[in-house]
Amino acid sequence: MIRILATGDETSAPAPEGRHSDGHDYVIMHLINREHCAGGVSRVYRKGAGRPEAETTLTEPMQTIVIDDRLMEHEVTPISPSGGPRAVRDMMIVDFDRE
């Protein structure tokens, strides 16, 4: 589980920060909870490509992104509070290998 919090005027970056691959065959990213968030845009790239293949904002619990981590990289933009005192973004990440 990864929880990102932001309060006041701060912006909080996801962990790990930046565009990356997890080093497994597949990655499954489930949104568990999202409260008062601006940002948190998920982007998926082919390895080495400049533009994202997909870009979406997960807004509802259990919305999911599944990628082939051998071929793709992913990133999430920082979050900040919107419409409340604290932004919360909870994700469950499942990495697995076929063997």
Predicted regions and their residues:
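Catalytic core of non-heme Fe(II) oxygenases with the double-stranded beta-helix
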Residues: 2-60
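Catalytic core of Fe(II)/2-oxoglutarate
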Residues: 41-99
